[in-house]
Amino acid sequence: MDDATNKKRKVFVSTILTFWNTDRRDFPWRHTRDPYVILITEILLRRTTAGHVKKIYDKFFVKYKCFEDILKTPKSEIAKDIKEIGLSNQRAEQLKELARVVINDYGGRVPRNRKAILDLPGVGKYTCAAVMCLAFGKKAAMVDANFVRVINRYFGGSYENLNYNHKALWELAETLVPGGKCRDFNLGLMDFSAIICAPRKPKCEKCGMSKLCSYYEKCST
């Protein structure tokens, strides 16, 4: 890795960590390391907004304190409880199946092994990384569409048009996650992508790394 590339990566990580420390958003699920709560919340957050999930969060976890509570509750009742966030029947079915497998195969506790988590029904690479990082403190890149967009824009070049499943993008993402700061970095990048490097009308003038950003350079010429 040449000096310029190394500097660009260091500035990226430093900017994201600084943003987390100064401008992060606050959601109730960020105040827990409970693997059950984190895993279920990730299911609830899919294809909806954090704002919608926030509205049902407290009530949901008061009623459903563990996988056993989900499994013993009729699907129709769960769907009714999460109706506000959308796709309620589909989510309720996913939650029931997930609860069944975790109870039958792991005694009702989320496994700590990455492969075991990935093998759970409805769990993909992002959700697995979220559980590994946010619940178990393991180094893992939480790569989603927002993560991809920021990498595409900032690093540009051979990374400019890489899609979510491209191996090179995941390899870069994993190298960016700083040891001991996995949670801060992943959540910081999530917030940065929502507030600064938004899909439309990014606030480049407020970005701490715009001088090294390929997207900003292209837009400025």
UniProtKB/Swiss-Prot annotation:
Result when mutating D144A: 15-fold lower activity
Effect of N146 to E/H: Almost no activity
Chain sites annotated for binding [4Fe-4S] cluster: C197, C204, C207, C213
Keywords annotated in UniProt: 4Fe-4S, DNA damage, DNA repair, Glycosidase, Hydrolase, Iron, Iron-sulfur, Metal-binding, Plasmid
Matching InterPro entries: DNA_glycosylase, Endonuclease-III-like_CS2, Endonuclease3_FeS-loop_motif, Endouclease-III_FeS-bd_BS, HhH-GPD_domain, HhH_base_excis_C, MIG/MutY
Impact reported for L187Q: Accelerates the A/G reaction and decreases activity on T/G and U/G. Changes substrate discrimination between T/G and A/G by a factor of 117 in favor of the latter
Pfam annotation, one family: HhH-GPD
Uppermost EC category: hydrolase
Any one GO molecular function term: 8-oxo-7,8-dihydroguanine DNA N-glycosylase activity
Cofactor or coenzyme needed: [4Fe-4S] cluster
Record family assignment: Belongs to the Nth/MutY family.
Protein name: Thymine/uracil-DNA glycosylase
